[in-house]
A protein has these predicted regions:
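Ferredoxin-reductase
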Residues: 2-90, 148-150, 178
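FNR/FR-type flavoprotein reductase catalytic core
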Residues: 4-5, 78-213
């Protein structure tokens, strides 16, 4: 961390995408049209608004994306309620990055990777997944096990089905908690699905999500 990470920068929320009923993805740029700072996969940043408050959020976009920065945020409190109510063009402040991030250039390099996520827990992992996709030659097979309450609650579902599922060397396993009309995939909780899949224990595992503490 250096002194620059402590200084809030004014940014513009240029786009807001509704991912699920309670998750939106916010795209930000400086007033000059640039990313506010560089980051590593897995790092986070503080977003604040005077008179409302501030909160720490995972940076969802990959560092390889040089055009903008994104945050996928679940509505679950004062700051997130306010964020979910704003419109594109709103200015906020951001500072960071914070955290160590994932060791993508050391421990993960050359390894077979297993990502396990539940609900909004995919948001912090999306950054490193897309980083590994960009530098595909540096990593082995990539397995992704992801689940949520329903199909409607699967974050980044379009990106998963349109991009991740179609790439060689990437295996995606989706599940939802309960039967749902129109869903022909796996049904069940993520921890149980992982046990069914019986993944190779030699894989390097990256995991995020409250429902996964019993794995």
């Amino acid at each position: 961390m250096n002194s620059e990470t402590l200084i809030p920068q004014v940014v513009v929320v240029t786009d807001i995408m509704k991912d699920t009923p309670d998750v939106k993805t916010f795209r930000i740029l400086t007033p000059e049209g640039k990313k506010p700072f560089d980051h590593m996969p897995g790092q986070c940043a503080m977003i604040s608004m005077p008179g409302v408050g501030e909160a720490l959020f995972s940076i969802t976009s990959s560092p390889t994306n040089t055009e903008f920065m994104e945050f996928s945020i679940k509505k679950c409190g004062c700051v997130t309620d306010w964020l979910h109510a704003i419109e594109p063009g709103q200015q906020v402040t951001v500072r960071g990055p914070y955290g160590n991030g994932f060791p993508v250039e050391t421990e993960l390099k050359g390894k077979d990777l297993l990502f396990i996520a539940g609900g909004i827990g995919l948001a912090p992992l999306r950054s490193v997944i897309n980083y590994c996709r960009h530098y595909r030659e540096n990593y082995g097979t990539i397995d992704i096990v992801y689940g949520s309450r329903s199909k409607d609650d699967l974050v980044d579902y379009q990106e998963i089905t349109d991009e991740w599922c179609r790439e060689d060397g990437i295996n995606v396993y989706l599940t939802i908690d309960r039967e749902q009309e129109g869903w022909d995939g796996h049904v069940g909780f993520v921890p149980n699905y992982v046990k069914e899949l019986n993944p190779d224990v030699s894989k390097t595992v990256l995991m995020c999500g409250l429902s996964l503490i019993h794995i």
